[in-house]
Amino acid sequence: MEKILEYLMEKYQPEGMIVYGSFADGSYNENSDFDVLVIASGEKRHDASVVDGTVLDAFVYPPEIFAGAFDPADFVQIFDGKIVLDSKGVAAKLRARVLAYLDALPLKSMDEVRQDVAWCRKMQSRTLRGDAEGFYRWHWLLTESLLIYCDARRWHYFGPKKALRQMQREQPGHFAAYRTALEDFTQSALSGWLDCLEESMDS
């Protein structure tokens, strides 16, 4: 990461940088991009250069963007990022604005969650048909139920990677059931996962 930061410093002379994604939380591997928001004078741009064998996903914004009105929803990806440079305090203010926005986001009502969980059981019955459509619905259910699980737990959903890590950390038994449903692809494993979903709704 040091060489990447050196490259960004030399090229953009930034006043702020927020690293987010896998390089911020330590989950990166050899295939990971380096996600970073750079605050630097000049025009807005995207840098996808390869530095030290790592592909950059660097979004460069002039500080003027954050001095006026902007939509924090456009920057939610940095909510748990690491501020590695902030000479004028703009990066800290940006992250605080994003966190305030996320705190104010409404969660689904429990009635809505119950309807979604009922949809999961209904969808499970449609996976029994044994044809291409049935298998499509099976995959669809496994994907969509992760979002519904987050709603049931009263978590905001920030993509599968963060959702799975949070589930593994806070609900390891449910994580094991979901992983089994994904890997085994059997009706019994699917039922076990949906049982966890219903349990979360009632907790």
What are these regions (language model features)?
Residues A24, E30-V36, V50-D52, I65-A67, ...:
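Generic preference for flexible, low-structure residues
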Residues S109-S203:
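Conserved nucleotidyltransferase catalytic core and NTase-mimicking acidic/glycine-rich helix/loop elements
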Residues M1, L5, G16-I18, V76, ...:
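Generic, low-specificity signal for short hydrophobic/alpha-helical stretches with a mild N-terminal bias
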Residues M1-N31, L37-V84:
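Metal-dependent nucleotidyltransferase catalytic core
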Residues D33-F34, G42-K44, A48, F59-P63, ...:
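Short alpha-helical interface elements
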Residues E2, E6, E10, E15, ...:
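Glutamate identity and glutamate-enriched acidic tracts
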Residues L5, K11-E15, G26, D35-L37, ...:
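Residue-level signal for well-ordered alpha-helical segments
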Residues D47-A132:
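Conserved NTP/Mg2+-binding pocket subregion across the NTase superfamily
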